[in-house]
Curated annotation (Swiss-Prot):
Component of the 30S ribosomal translation pre-initiation complex which assembles on the 30S ribosome in the order IF-2 and IF-3, IF-1 and N-formylmethionyl-tRNA(fMet); mRNA recruitment can occur at any time during PIC assembly. This is Translation initiation factor IF-1. It comes from Methylococcus capsulatus (strain ATCC 33009 / NCIMB 11132 / Bath). Belongs to the IF-1 family. Coiled coil: none annotated. One of the essential components for the initiation of protein synthesis. Stabilizes the binding of IF-2 and IF-3 on the 30S subunit to which N-formylmethionyl-tRNA(fMet) subsequently binds. Helps modulate mRNA selection, yielding the 30S pre-initiation complex (PIC). Upon addition of the 50S ribosomal subunit IF-1, IF-2 and IF-3 are released leaving the mature 70S translation initiation complex.
Length: 72
């Protein structure tokens, strides 16, 4: 699947779950389960509850996402 197939959205981290997984509420109100992308994990980017993040969703499963950017 190419990068163009992903849906990019922004949201807010509302809960931290085990294994670097987070519950994120998107700007449209939907809640998804998101994990950290590999580059963020490699560079030790810390994500806390309340952070604004950019996530990528796949069109096949809109309940799971990947966190690709943490806003300041």
């Amino acid at each position: 699947m190419s990068k163009e197939d992903h849906i990019e959205m922004e949201g807010k981290v509302i809960e931290t779950l085990p294994n670097t997984t987070f519950r994120v509420q998107l700007d449209n109100g939907h809640v998804v389960i998101a994990h950290i992308s590999g580059k963020m994990r490699k560079n030790y980017i810390r994500i806390l509850t309340g952070d604004r993040v950019k996530v990528e969703l796949t069109p096949y499963d809109l309940s799971k996402a990947r966190i690709t950017f943490r806003h300041r």
